[in-house]
C-alpha cells in the first residue's frame, strides 16, 4: 500500500466531484490510507484508475468495488 500526500488526495476528490458529483471518502489511519465510494459505478472506477495512473499510482479495488487502496 502506498501513502500519498494530502494534496494528491484533494486533487482526486476534486476531480471526482467535478466530473461525477461523487464524494470520495478518504481514510487515513495508522495502518495506512484507503478510499471508499458512495456510488457503485464502473465509469467512476475507471476514471479513478486512469486519473491515478497519470500520477504513477495503481488503484486496487476490493471485491465490492467500493473501496480501494493505491500501489
Model-identified regions with their sequence ranges:
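Generic detector of leucine side chains in alpha-helical contexts
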Residues: 10-12, 37, 70
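A generic structural signal for short
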Residues: 1, 36-37
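Detector for the mature cores of small, proteolytically processed
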Residues: 41-71
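Surface-exposed aromatic
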Residues: 30-36
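N-terminal acidic leader/helix
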Residues: 1-30, 65
